[in-house]
Amino acid sequence: MLESANVLCDCWRMEIDAFGFEHTYRALPEQFYARREPTAVDGPRLFALNKELATRLRLPLPTLVAHGAQIFSGNQLPPDAQPIALAYAGHQFGGFVPQLGDGRALLIGELVDCEGRRRDLQLKGAGPTPFSRRGDGRAALGPVMREYLVSEAMHALGIPTTRALAAVTTGESVVREEVLPGAVLTRVAASHLRVGTFEYFAAQSDWPSVEQLARYAIDRHYPELNGSDRPFLGLLKGVAERQAALVADWMKVGFIHGVMNTDNSSISGETIDYGPCAFMDAYDPKTVFSAIDRSGRYAFSNQPDIAQWNLARLAETLLPLIDSDLEKAVEAAREVIQNMLPDFEGKWLANMRAKIGLQTEHATDRALVEELLEIMHRCGADFTQTFRRLCDATQAAEMPSATGERFGLSSEYDAWALRWKQRLAMEKTTVAEQSDLMRRSNPARIPRNHRIEEAIQAAVLADDFGPFQRLGAALCEPYRESEEYREFEIPPTEAQRVRRTFCGT
């Protein structure tokens, strides 16, 4: 099989054209990365190709369709690819690890998309690198499928995220807790700059590299800071604002990242490294899915505090750049860090107002939202479907109590619903406009954990990717109700409920 694959590669080498890759990160000094070619695999097979994203990246679709298995497995890269593994450190569950880096991923190049935005292309699972730490550098099929489905679902939900361009099976096995099929994911990101990237150089007191990295981050993600009197303080503020908005968006849809280490905290403000991520079914602010998060550090309700903690770690790396006077630098950074949670609270409350049909601000809004969440928690109400069914409850023809019964909520809902209706009456919008706002703010479908597991099991056990394709299609338009995909709106039964998720590394 390997021989025939090599023959295909030899024939194909004459056909492949350059993709138009650029390499601004590779132009940095070599302490920022390690050069490494992908490790070839025996029998790659393309099982997912994101044609919409490929078109946005101005990639040649006929080439991807014909030769995607070879390209996206890393067996045969475009001639202008220059693969590198990025160096970074990170705080993992609060403990500092001075060297992590891309242990199984290779950045093969950057593309400027049709909107003029620079995007990284990375192969995840492409083989060992100098940062693999005795790992095999490979990815299992299940985690690749999970990241593909969830990252694309997050994009459809309107939440900043890395995206999935393609996924291939490798024809080889990987050994984790058990022997599993191998796979490679092609990830697209605004960049792969992380808080941990800054920590890597700061831990070595390599301040020239920290400054070089900070200037690169500003040029790429915060160009408005060029020419600013205090660009590095501005960088810290920019990251704080984007991370506050990102976590507020996560919590709007019940998303739990699961492993918010600083090496998984993006400077661009995107969701990155999905690992043991999951969406809540029944609302519980203390929900934890990750099997390795035994203390609940990254529970749903802890995410804003963890984002602030991660920001403080970034601030520590930037202090010498913010001001030559350490006391002044600390004071300036502290103000940014302290402002992050109030900023998050404002963004979160704005999101929650929209979820219950409100556009204007009122002093009682927070209490109104929190009371509903408390009722949902006590009753074990499904987070997604409760808010989606509230869209119907704005219609005058439906009594609040009928809506409450539909969710399985207690009689407490009736009293809350009356106060909610009174608050809606204070708005200048019509009932139809309120309902429309809610339908744009409350998805009908999310990537429910049991549905993802069903798709993974079908692929792993029976080589059946039909459930994966169908689930992916159902998640493309999450705010539009569809009879065709009604099954994906239904919460899991007790027997179907997924209680633990895994990183897959």
Give short role names for the model-derived ranges:
Residues 143-144, 173-257, 268-374:
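ATP-dependent phospho-/nucleotidyl transfer catalytic cores
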